[in-house]
């Protein structure tokens, strides 16, 4: 039985690929024994037949058929010929989706350096060779020679750079009749870099560096440590330094660099095809020049152009002039496809679109509890549709899924009742990008609301770093019982009061909440409607406010026979009055107390504002609940 994809490997590792590994990616042996995989022609499709050219960038023999179960020449059609390789065109009869993963390769006529390892920061080539980056660049781009073997010359040193004139002068001395010089070898271009890297013994270099590090200090020591770290990494991964010089280039599958026909008969193509075409053209031209034994200067110029073409393919604009297409637009290289927000990793691998998710603008929901969020009905019915359908069938309201979907589309009133049942106790996850810490995604109990905006409790905003000026948030529905229970126990907003970074409360009132509390409890000394009125209890005062008999900031007297706790340490009465019946009335700063002669409380009135009554009652009700 075939294993699931995730069980066929343990982990993904990014590293240097050897030339043999690159060949393995693209090379296949057909049943008739023919090896295919090498792309040798720059052509893409035939302009008359609109079929891919053989051995070109869209070759069906290398990458697989363009149409399902059909070979290039049309001899074999239909699925019954599965796995057969056409004896005429050599195309395997299989599904066209293999063109999404089958690769090819280009065998280079001359080695080229990988621009990432040359021009990256740090430059691994210059670190390993222990040469300045400028010198390595001059060698790679055919501006200077490097001594590979000084021979018996006393004036030359290993890895010494020579200009064109200096090398010509030494050549004259070597070939002179009375010359005693011999064994001198110099190189230029990526071939010379490859030779230097091949001669590097990593174990010996690492041992030598460790000894030097002990004796050195300061800047020199830091440089040696950096070099040792790179060498140790090469040894640990089993990679060879000369793999940074390419002799084979992989050609990515054609469906990842497509060519599509537009309405007017013209074709739109990926920039990669143009960059690959440049490499193949220059590579083929270099091969022909080498076959006809062209002058060294012409061959060298072609090698430099091949190096620049490969640089543009891997990372356009990293070095030299940027290759541009129509309208002077820089062509997108392999690096451009990988890197950045719209790149393959962040756009397609890390940030995939997922089912059972939605996105909308957030607005404040002041009437929500801290663990609740307002979910628009339109969004909720879409997200919870499978649960609603299951419930409708279970209740016997419909007989099958198709009927349930029609019922939902009609907006039947029963659907909304079922939806209410389904979402009860089913938490949803809210996420606000960028998710910089674990509180960037939290669980909430959904409450159905009208409109199209997600309602969020203002107290959870600091955790999400959200505000209500147009921010958007994503909603995800946990499907399995395990994920639902985990969301409820670990991710519910009311369980995330403290910041995991500092341990301090992250849920704190701010902005309009603080302003609202201030406005509610502030006093206004000007004449207010209903000021100095007497009310039998708190409810009586609130009822008067709702009827418009008293203003929010008006001072009123409210009867409250409970014990009053005050911040003032010695709360003594300002005035005391004794009535004819023997009762005593004590006047404090913010209250009046009437007691019997022996000190028993008869009644007590508090001097406060309606706003403070509302504030106090809200806090009390919350604490009791």
Curated annotation (Swiss-Prot):
Q: Which UniProt keywords apply?
A: DNA-directed RNA polymerase, Magnesium, Metal-binding, Nucleotidyltransferase, Transcription, Transferase, Zinc
Output the Gene Ontology cellular-component terms. Answer: DNA-directed RNA polymerase complex
What does the note under cofactor report?
Binds 1 Mg(2+) ion per subunit. Binds 1 Zn(2+) ion per subunit.
Q: Which GO terms describe its molecular function?
A: DNA binding; DNA-directed RNA polymerase activity; magnesium ion binding; zinc ion binding
- Which Pfam family, any one, appears in the UniProt record? RNA_pol_Rpb1_1
Keyword Secreted in annotation? no
> What are its GO biological-process terms?
DNA-templated transcription
Alphabetical list of InterPro entries matching this protein = DNA-dir_RpoC1_gamma, DNA-dir_RpoC_beta_prime, RNA_pol_asu, RNA_pol_N, RNA_pol_Rpb1_1, RNA_pol_Rpb1_3, RNA_pol_Rpb1_3_sf, RNA_pol_Rpb1_clamp_domain
Residues engaged in binding Zn(2+): 71, 73, 86, 89
At the top level, the lineage of the source is Bacteria
Q: Which cofactor does it need?
A: Mg(2+); Zn(2+)
Q: Which residues bind Mg(2+)?
A: 467, 469, 471
EC code? 2.7.7.6
Which reaction is the catalytic activity of this chain? RNA(n) + a ribonucleoside 5'-triphosphate = RNA(n+1) + diphosphate
Q: Which family is annotated?
A: Belongs to the RNA polymerase beta' chain family. RpoC1 subfamily.
Q: How does it assemble?
A: In cyanobacteria the RNAP catalytic core is composed of 2 alpha, 1 beta, 1 beta', 1 gamma and 1 omega subunit. When a sigma factor is associated with the core the holoenzyme is formed, which can initiate transcription.
| Function summary | DNA-dependent RNA polymerase catalyzes the transcription of DNA into RNA using the four ribonucleoside triphosphates as substrates.
Q: What is this protein called?
A: DNA-directed RNA polymerase subunit gamma
* Source organism: Gloeothece citriformis (strain PCC 7424) (Cyanothece sp. (strain PCC 7424))
Q: Which gene encodes it?
A: rpoC1
């Amino acid at each position: 039985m075939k294993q699931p994809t995730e069980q066929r490997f343990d982990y993904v590792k990014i590293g240097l690929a050897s030339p043999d590994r690159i060949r393995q990616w693209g090379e296949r042996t057909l049943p008739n024994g023919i090896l295919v995989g090498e792309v040798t022609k720059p052509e893409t499709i035939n302009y008359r037949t609109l079929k891919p050219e053989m051995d070109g960038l869209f070759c069906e023999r290398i990458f697989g058929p363009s149409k399902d179960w059909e070979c290039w020449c049309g001899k074999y059609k239909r699925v019954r010929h599965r796995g057969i390789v056409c004896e005429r065109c050599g195309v395997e009869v299989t599904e066209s989706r293999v063109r999404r993963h089958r690769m090819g390769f280009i065998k280079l006529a001359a080695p080229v350096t990988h621009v990432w390892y040359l021009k990256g920061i740090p430059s691994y080539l210059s670190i390993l060779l222990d040469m300045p980056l400028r010198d390595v660049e001059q060698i790679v781009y055919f501006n200077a020679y490097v001594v590979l073997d000084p021979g018996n010359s006393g004036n030359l040193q290993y890895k010494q750079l020579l200009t064109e004139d200096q090398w010509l002068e030494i050549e004259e001395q070597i070939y002179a009749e009375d010359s005693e010089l011999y064994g001198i070898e110099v190189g230029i271009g990526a071939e010379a870099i490859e030779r230097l890297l091949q001669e590097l013994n990593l174990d010996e270099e690492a041992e030598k560096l460790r000894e030097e590090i002990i004796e050195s200090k300061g800047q020199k020591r830091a440089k040696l440590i950096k070099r040792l770290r790179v060498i140790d990494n090469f040894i640990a991964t089993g990679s060879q330094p000369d793999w940074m010089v390419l002799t084979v280039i992989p050609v990515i599958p054609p469906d990842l660099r497509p060519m599509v026909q537009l309405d007017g008969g013209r074709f739109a193509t990926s920039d990669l095809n143009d960059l690959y075409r440049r490499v193949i053209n220059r590579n083929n031209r270099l091969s022909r020049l080498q076959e006809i034994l062209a002058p060294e200067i012409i061959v060298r110029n072609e090698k430099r152009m091949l190096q620049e073409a490969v640089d543009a393919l891997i990372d356009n604009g990293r070095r030299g002039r940027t290759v541009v297409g129509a309208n002077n637009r820089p062509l997108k290289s392999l690096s451009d496809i990988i890197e950045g927000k719209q790149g393959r990793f962040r756009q397609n691998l890390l940030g995939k679109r997922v089912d059972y998710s939605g996105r909308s603008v957030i607005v404040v929901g002041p009437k929500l509890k801290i663990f609740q969020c307002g979910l628009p009905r339109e969004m909720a019915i879409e997200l919870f549709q499978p649960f609603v359908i299951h419930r409708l069938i279970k209740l016997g309201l419909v007989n099958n899924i198709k009927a349930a979907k029609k019922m939902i589309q009609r907006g039947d009133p029963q659907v909304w009742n079922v939806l209410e049942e389904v979402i009860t106790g089913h938490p949803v996850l809210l996420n606000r990008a960028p998710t910089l810490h674990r509180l960037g995604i939290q669980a909430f109990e959904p409450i159905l609301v009208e409109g199209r905006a997600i309602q969020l409790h203002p107290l959870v905003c600091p955790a999400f770093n959200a505000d209500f000026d147009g921010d958007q948030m994503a909603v995800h529905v946990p499907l399995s019982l395990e994920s639902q229970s985990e969301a409820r126990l670990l991710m519910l907003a009311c369980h995330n009061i403290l910041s995991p970074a500092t341990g301090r409360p992250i849920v704190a009132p701010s902005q309009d909440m603080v302003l609202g509390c201030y406005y509610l409890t502030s006093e206004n000394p000007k004449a207010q409607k209903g000021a100095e009125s007497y009310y039998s209890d708190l409810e009586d005062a609130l009822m008067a406010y709702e009827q418009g008999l008293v203003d929010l900031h008006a001072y009123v007297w409210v009867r409250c026979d409970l014990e009053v706790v005050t911040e003032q340490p010695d709360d003594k009465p300002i005035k005391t009055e004794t009535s004819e019946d023997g009762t005593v009335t004590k006047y404090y700063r913010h209250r009046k107390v009437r007691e019997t002669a022996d000190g028993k409380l008869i009644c007590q009135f508090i001097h406060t504002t309606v706003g403070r009554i509302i504030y106090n009652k809200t806090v009390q009700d919350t604490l009791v609940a």
